[in-house]
Amino acid sequence: KIAKIREDFSYALIHDMKTPISSILMGIQILETGKLDTRPEKRAKLFHILKDESEHLLALTEKVLTLSKLENHQLNLFREMLSLRSMLDDLIEKFSAKADKPVHFSLALEAETVVADGEFLKEAISNLIDNAIKYSGASVAIIISSFCKPDGAVVIKVKDNGFGIPLKDQSRIFEKYERASATERSRKGGASGFGLGLNYVFRVAEAHGGTVEVESIEGEYSEFSLSLPQKEFLDSVEEK
């Protein structure tokens, strides 16, 4: 079974890397012909595409390396008090600018601050937003909320109006090689590939001593809840 999992993951990783590599190669071949030498606007647009695809490929390789370190507990987290609203405002600006379809964001933050590693938390939430956009129709509505649990943990929720996840797949979507019903969701306009992003969220939650859960109704919505403990860190600060 382990060998099969590794085989599936390797195949999926190659599949996900193939698209940006193909785009980069095709762009270079077009530039080599010299056809765009007298068309500066199209040439500039192609360079922009090449840059985006190169950054996508680099981000993918970095995510694989980070996942490996998280799995082996080799990554040290730098926990600090963060402004959740400020982090989300940055992400909303980023995704609103690059999305290829209308995306409406709503914030409902009862917890305005959170103790976490800012870099990893931001990337985890970014992955949840990215999935929400990929697996939704022509118009996307995303609600991001937060609140404090009685034990002090901060919960961050990301809810979309997308295609949803079949109940039979929900227990497997955080596995590194899994992307639930990718073929079916692709037919509905979703992304193809595999679920590195959700496994990353799972590993970041785990590294913080927290959890991530999903609630979804196929054809209606998906809501991911990221719970991050706060008490241990805050108690250690008070002791100092």
Task: Give the location of each predicted region.
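Short alpha-helical segment of the dimerization/phosphotransfer core of two-component systems
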Residues: 52-57
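A conserved beta-strand-to-alpha-helix junction within the catalytic ATP-binding
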Residues: 78-93, 122
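Short conserved segment of the HATPase_c
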Residues: 165-178, 182
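Conserved micro-motifs of the catalytic ATP-binding
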Residues: 72-77, 113-116
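Short beta-strand/loop element within the Bergerat-fold HATPase_c
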Residues: 139-152
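Short helix-loop "hinge" at the ATP-lid/N-box region of the Bergerat-fold HATPase_c
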Residues: 132-133
